Amino acid sequence: MLCLTRLRANVNKVAFMEMVKDLRFRTEAPIAECGAALKETHGDVEKAMEVLRKKGAARAMKKRSRVTEHGSVVACVGGLFGAAVITVCSETDFAARSAQFQNTCARVKVALQRKIIDSKGDVLTNPTEAHRSLVEATAEDIRSSIAVLGENVTIKSVESLRLAPHVAEHISIGSYTHGSLDVPDVGRIAGVVAVSRLDPTKEVQASTLTDVARHFVASSGAEGNYAHQNFFGTEETVGQWLKRHGLCFSSSLVVDFGKEPITHTASQPRNAVKHPEG
């Protein structure tokens, strides 16, 4: 009889641990909290998930005032409609390098991409409004990340790529991220670039756009006219390289985490005709 009782106890323990494992997989909450939530709800996994969600939201509210000085920048390209760089912050570098944080950044990028495409780029005309809208759209995801990481996570800013008005047709947009931890478009430095196709019937290879964005990331601290710089890894100037690839530069945006954005915009041609007003 005693052996049978012990056997049942062991079976119940194994079943309980399986439920804890399942709950942790579904919520990413700490094991101890999963166990406590299951005991509180008498083994009801769905109710336990709700308990963990409420506790996570409560902790998130308490942590929102904490200073966030670490994090990543995220390159976000919304098809042909525009691009931006998002800055997402955490309290510690340890959290910023975690898979949870990095994957949260990737989901934030997808949320902004949808907004760019759905609005045909209009959302980027006002970066402050774009930031507010993105924070609102990802609030639940950010709260979940705070609950898992145990520290504050914030979307600090959205910087928009602005096209040169006189080079705004037949545009292709590319991006490059430096210092990535295996999550695409998330890293320490992110750059987005817009170029115009000299022959609108020809498409630009994705690798070519990446090369252009990589150049501006690599030379973001350089002084002088970008067109006269050597293109990254070549003996050609930027202007020569772009011309050989049938491209005309419009604009670039590079954000190094924690630093001011660096932008370049194509200069207005000196011989451009100015039409009198009125």
Swiss-Prot record:
Transmembrane region(s): none
Domain of life according to the entry: Eukaryota
Family stated for the protein in its record: Belongs to the EF-Ts family.
Protein role: Associates with the EF-Tu.GDP complex and induces the exchange of GDP to GTP. It remains bound to the aminoacyl-tRNA.EF-Tu.GTP complex up to the GTP hydrolysis stage on the ribosome.
Molecular function via GO: translation elongation factor activity
Entry's localization field: Mitochondrion
GO cellular component: mitochondrion
Protein name from the UniProt record: Elongation factor Ts 1, mitochondrial
Note: This protein may be expected to contain an N-terminal transit peptide but none has been predicted.
The entry's keywords: Elongation factor, Mitochondrion, Protein biosynthesis
Protein's GO biological process: mitochondrial translational elongation
